[in-house]
């Protein structure tokens, strides 16, 4: 095996395991390690594919996945894993949802709601937080008025912050909304309730998007 693999269980909010077990900082600290690759699956099928990919990978690699029952949705979307490349689930224009890991499930709910409201909307499964898909990110502002990043990690050092830095470095003007957990410890509680409290559930995300579009 050519890789140094880290399997990150309990990534994101874990609810009943308690405050000390909330996995909401790992994207931030893992992304600071030179040469580290950080990825997360959207469902159980992609987790299997990522594990197989990691076995033959050369270099340090971390796969993060959440606690609880494995998500079985979006099974028909199973493009091969390619280094630093995302996966388009719905390709349209208007609003772009770029979701990482477990937030793809939430993003699919948001996408369906926005479509019902009459908005054109794309959905991208980021797959990699490091390295992120720079080619995909460069393409989005050409056909989208709003780019929304979605992650189950704190804001500081997270996926959304890296995307914002990328657009700034490229001097790309785009409206960007980062959906992430506030920079604070999250208490013990039911995971679904906690997601609503920190603003990363589908209802909260839709509200944030509507507010952003009104600006």
Please place each PLM-identified region on the residue numbering:
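Thiamine diphosphate
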Residues: 13-23, 56-215
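Conserved thiamine diphosphate
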Residues: 10-56, 208
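Short, small-residue-biased leader/transition segments that mark boundaries at the very start
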Residues: 1-7
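Active-site nucleophile and cofactor-binding loops and adjacent substrate-binding regions
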Residues: 8-9, 40-42, 152-157
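Acidic-residue sensor for enzyme active/binding pockets
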Residues: 4, 46, 151-152
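Alpha-helix C-terminal capping segments
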Residues: 3, 32, 166-170
